[in-house]
């Protein structure tokens, strides 16, 4: 055994001993808390026998209305988060949904027995407090306690500092603890709700109709992604969780709903990183008689509206970079952005073979074999390699190749491209939009081409959807459509570095069970 291995063994033994010591300490704390619960139950004061609490105010209401409530009696409820009681008096803090309210206890007001009982309360316990509103000499709004009651017992101690925990993923695995400890996390998720509300408000004000479409279907289409699959026992039918809402929403356009949107969960059986979670929230919207230019206008104004609503401005700081979301956003073609950042003028490339030579020269990473790549595939790869990360300020990249846009109308005046754009902020895609293809003959041909792509090994290529073709044959008017990842929008508007920071319970690999 080498010296390094001996040293490693010593370190491991030290860690094991430390863990055993910490576990023993934790076991003692758990026993102590359970004993306190047992003692309370023996006194006929089982906190778990409390069914309903009548509180008169929240912490926010007291702070916001202090002038009216000064010297008034109020009742609040929340989690005990600090306790500083010495002798016959002391201060404590409880937290509710909105934040903190300070308590002042004095033996003359609550009595000796109640003060003694309060001293047995633990950090994390839930209490209901009645008291008079006043300000301390330092100006802090406080309740002078006259009544108190334990209404739920915390049997496990909270971590004192979340960042001191050994498992860096614990805040995602046990989000309930993260929400208790970190006020800024609570604020992020409250802001998330406000952002989604603002988006709804914006679209409702423009006479869009919110709808719901199936989450389970026999065909997973509307996006380039692998689905999650399941089996319906009663129907003996293989089904998939949706990867997009697009094709159902377009059916509603066919049916006469001229402006529709849906905010809901999509599911894609793909990797997990700072921008991707297998279960995520999307908004898709479609408007009859509109095109992708209208969708650009809707998109930039919707984002700016939501940002103004929740942040009071259309300017944000994301990971230290100032970003201005004020419309209008920059518009640039994919060909031009590739030329700007790589020097390659793709408008002069005439054949697939010319494009493949460029791909070889630039050593591009491609999603399929070079011999199977078209001009469009290679242009997109050049954009991803040279252009995408440079788009810090809000930018609409327009006119994508037809080969990678199977649901999109061809560009007016240039049929090699389509009327499609993607929006980028901080080098990241935030939305995807089209002048929607409504020609059933062309759409069926595009689906057939996608089937060939699947045969070549692209399991993210679109599947054939015969019923959607049937809907197009019934007739769909010219339509503009847009899809946006709501989680990514929330990331930007809350300055959150990871998608897991804006999803309450992100997908995580299970931890081994411990006895």
From Swiss-Prot:
Protein's cellular compartments: Cytoplasm
Residues that bind Mg(2+) 1: 422, 429
UniProt keyword Nucleotide-binding present: yes
Its EC number(s): 6.1.1.6
Cofactor-binding details, from the entry: Binds 3 Mg(2+) ions per subunit.
GO cellular component, one term: cytosol
Record field: catalytic activity: tRNA(Lys) + L-lysine + ATP = L-lysyl-tRNA(Lys) + AMP + diphosphate
GO biological process: lysyl-tRNA aminoacylation
Family: Belongs to the class-II aminoacyl-tRNA synthetase family.
Protein's recorded name: Lysine--tRNA ligase
Annotated organism of origin: Clostridium acetobutylicum (strain ATCC 824 / DSM 792 / JCM 1419 / IAM 19013 / LMG 5710 / NBRC 13948 / NRRL B-527 / VKM B-1787 / 2291 / W)
Name of the gene: lysS
């Amino acid at each position: 055994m080498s010296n390094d291995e001996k040293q490693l063994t010593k370190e491991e033994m030290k860690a094991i001993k430390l863990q055993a010591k910490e576990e023993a300490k934790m076991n003692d704390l758990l026993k102590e808390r359970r004993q306190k619960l047992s003692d309370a139950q023996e006194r006929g004061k089982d906190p778990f026998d409390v069914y309903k609490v009548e509180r008169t105010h929240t912490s926010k209401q007291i702070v916001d209305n202090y002038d009216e409530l000064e010297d008034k009696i109020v009742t609040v409820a929340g989690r005990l988060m600090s306790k500083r009681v010495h002798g016959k008096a002391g201060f404590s803090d409880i937290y509710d949904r909105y934040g903190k309210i300070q308590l002042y206890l004095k033996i003359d007001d609550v009595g000796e027995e109640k003060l003694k009982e309060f001293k047995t309360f633990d950090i994390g316990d839930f209490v209901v407090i009645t008291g008079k509103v006043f300000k301390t000499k330092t100006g802090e709004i406080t309740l002078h306690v006259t009544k108190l009651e334990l209404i739920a017992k915390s049997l496990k101690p909270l971590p004192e500092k979340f960042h001191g925990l050994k498992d860096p993923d614990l805040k995602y695995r046990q989000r309930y603890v993260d929400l208790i400890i970190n006020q800024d996390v609570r604020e992020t998720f409250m802001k998330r709700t406000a952002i989604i509300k603002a988006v709804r408000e914006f679209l409702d004000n423009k006479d869009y109709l919110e709808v719901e479409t199936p989450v389970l279907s026999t065909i997973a289409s509307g996006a380039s992604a692998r689905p999650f699959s399941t089996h319906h026992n009663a129907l003996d039918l293989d089904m998939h969780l949706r990867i997009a809402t697009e094709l159902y929403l377009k059916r509603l356009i066919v049916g006469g709903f001229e402006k529709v949107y849906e905010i809901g969960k999509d599911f894609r059986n793909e990797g997990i990183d700072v921008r991707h979670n297998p279960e995520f929230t999307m908004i898709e919207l479609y408007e009859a008689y509109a095109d992708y230019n209208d969708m650009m206008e809707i998109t930039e104004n919707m984002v700016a509206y939501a940002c103004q609503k929740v942040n009071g401005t259309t300017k944000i700081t994301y990971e230290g970079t100032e970003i201005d979301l004020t419309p209008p956003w920059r518009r640039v073609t994919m060909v031009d952005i590739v030329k700007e950042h790589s020097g390659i003028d793709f408008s002069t490339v005439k054949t697939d073979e010319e494009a493949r030579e460029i791909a070889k020269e630039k050593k591009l990473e491609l999603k399929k074999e070079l011999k199977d790549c078209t001009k469009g595939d290679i242009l997109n790869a050049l954009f991803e390699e040279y252009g995408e990360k440079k788009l810090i300020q809000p930018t609409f990249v327009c006119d994508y190749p037809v080969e990678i846009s199977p649901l999109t109308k061809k560009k007016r005046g240039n049929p090699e491209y389509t009327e499609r754009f993607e929006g980028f902020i901080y080098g990241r895609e935030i939305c995807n939009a089209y002048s929607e293809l409504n020609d059933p003959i062309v759409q069926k041909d595009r689906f057939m081409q996608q089937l060939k792509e699947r045969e070549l090994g692209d399991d993210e290529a679109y599947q054939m959807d015969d019923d959607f073709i049937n809907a197009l044959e019934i007739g769909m008017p010219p339509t503009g459509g847009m899809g946006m990842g709501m989680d990514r929008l929330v990331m930007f508007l809350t300055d959150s570095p990871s998608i897991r920071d804006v999803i309450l319970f992100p997908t995580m690999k299970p931890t081994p069970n411990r006895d």
